[in-house]
Amino acid sequence: MPRPPWSDRHAQIHRGLRVRPLLPPGCGVVVAVSGGQDSVALLRLLVDLQPKWHWRLWAVHCDHGWRPDSAENAAFVADLCQSWGVPCQVIAAETRPTTEADARQWRYEALGDVAQTLGATHIATGHTATDRAETLLYNLLRGSGTDGLQALAWQRSLSPAQPGLTVVRPLLDLTRQDTAQFCQQFNLPVWIDSTNADLTYARNRLRLEVFPLLQRHFNPRVDQTLAQTAEILTAEVALLDQMTEELYAKTVQPQDLSWVIQRSVLRSAPLALQRRVLRRVLQRVMTAPVSFDHGEKLVALMAAPNRSQTDPFPGGWLARVEADQIRLMPKADG
């Protein structure tokens, strides 16, 4: 059997996986393959590294049915995987997703279902440093705290319902330019997705209009710079999460049909931790995403006089000061 090809990129990913053990030796890995340059580069790298790591590899292509050529795209991926000796499944959406968010949720659910059926423990995606930078900037422009700005961690649990499945992103040290060069170096076939040029999608406008401007006029390595910022924030958010968890346990208790917050204990903590604890309480009761303004309504009650209260939050709950406590409770009918 001929030896797999080797390059600086192979060595980089191999070293990275030894330092950051995203894919343990011998584990089962479902690789998400769209056919674009990032996922093709990822699959080729994992196939070439497989003799060193002894992974069990499967490829999965998710067909949203959004484009007239989606069936051709799926066939392209299936043929590519067959030529590389990788078992491949094509999953077609029974109901076409209507938004990018819906499509993303469906993809991960489909990947998780296949992984569980096959006995895989990991799902690998081709996200790069460029994706990480775009996600950070996108979340910043929409309005986000540090949780949103950490953007695409190296690994995460797929979902609380599937705790045994881990999503990993082995290419976060590479940019989109790096994966393009890798595909060119090894003459890898790549499927060109026509929707990537559609400027009705916000992320495409960032990719095609905003980032080129930032690279020309501010920083030619802006994607790497923002990705590094996301990496720093990821570590800091992990610390904040731990501190928040400890403070939450000391200051928040369920009581009958309400949640009670101990003001004096929480007030002694830094404002950043107060906000995170109060946001976590609101996430338990609100039917809409918790905005900055929602959180600040609770923050204002930390020093408010007795019997002060908020307007109802989405979902019908309101907060009221009761001596040294804040009680979050359903709004009484009438």
Q: What label would you give each PLM region?
A:
Residues A75-G85, Y108-T117, S144-Q150, R221, ...:
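A short, terminal or domain-edge coil/loop segment
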Residues D173-E245, A249:
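Contiguous mid-protein beta-loop-alpha structural module that forms a pocket-lining wall or clamp
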Residues M1-L208:
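Core alpha/beta nucleotide-donor-binding catalytic domains of modification enzymes
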Residues P2-D38, W58, C62-H64, A93-T95, ...:
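AMP-forming adenylation/ATP pyrophosphatase catalytic core
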Residues W53, T121, R221, V285-P289:
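Secondary-structure boundary/capping positions in well-ordered alpha/beta enzyme cores
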